[in-house]
A protein has these predicted regions:
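Extended intrinsically disordered or low-complexity regions, especially N/C-terminal cytosolic tails and loops
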Residues: 1-84, 134-138, 162-241
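Flexible secondary-structure boundary motifs
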Residues: 80, 84, 88-187, 191-195, ...
């Protein structure tokens, strides 16, 4: 069911945004719950089997380190997968815009689709779509490079690697290790990326919707003028004159 006032494509934007938001929260909750249960079980076993001996207690606790490390690694990998899914949501919706609004897409690379849409809009309507510049920069540069790193394991251009790691070094929620590893350390980073993409998508959809609405109004006015002309100047009946 489409929310009142939403286009089909806007409903898709909102629905998929909601699903991804829920996935971010749900996966984090599951791993955190699992980790807490492991820690509590480790503490219980250590207390029950150490007879108050401090060293024995900590030896038993340390035996669970591998389990905790595995849980942490799984959560880290899950965040990488989720980030790639979030970026895919963005690119998929851009392609949906091209189909839905019948936009002439001259992009030869996925990274050029947004620019192609913005140029097509300006050519057709003589106006620019004003998206938040920082969001567009993050989407086309930082987030795209991070997605490419996660998907391919490395970046082919040293320039891209330097750009990505410069961004990552000053971005909350990311940790860098060496010259080729970036870890998403918390969910806030995922939510920020998701909100960034949604903001761009809504901005584009609102612009096209407004223009289509204006075109519909002009069409209705034209129909009213024709109807009024017919009422005021009815055609002559055959046989008269």
């Amino acid at each position: 069911m489409i929310a009142k006032g939403y286009t089909n494509i806007r409903a898709m934007i909102e629905t998929q945004y909601g699903i991804l938001s829920h996935m971010i929260t749900d996966i984090a909750y599951r791993y955190q719950t699992q980790l807490k249960q492991t820690e509590e079980e480790a503490d219980r076993l250590a207390r029950d089997n150490s007879d108050g001996d401090y060293e024995v207690y900590h030896t038993i606790l340390n035996s669970f380190n591998d389990v905790e490390e595995r849980s942490y690694c799984l959560m880290t990998e899950s965040r990488k997968i989720l980030f790639c899914a979030i970026f895919s949501y963005y690119e998929t919706m851009l392609n949906e815009f091209v189909l839905y609004y019948k936009i002439a897409n001259n992009a030869t690379l996925p990274s050029q689709i947004l620019d192609s849409i913005l140029k097509a809009y300006k050519t057709k309507y003589g106006e620019e779509i004003t998206c938040i510049e920082e969001n567009v920069e993050y989407a086309n540069s930082f987030y795209r490079l991070l997605r490419n790193l996660y998907m391919h394991g490395s970046l082919s251009k040293e320039n891209d690697r330097c750009t990505l790691f410069n961004y990552a070094g000053v971005t909350n929620g990311l940790k860098t290790f060496g010259i080729d590893t970036i870890i998403i350390a918390d969910n806030d980073f995922l939510f920020k990326a998701l909100d960034c993409f949604k903001t761009i998508l809504v901005c584009v959809d609102d612009a096209f919707t407004q223009q289509l609405s204006e075109e519909q109004k002009q069409l209705m006015r034209a129909k009213d003028i024709i109807r009024e002309a017919i009422n005021n100047y009815p055609p002559e009946m055959p046989g008269r004159g």
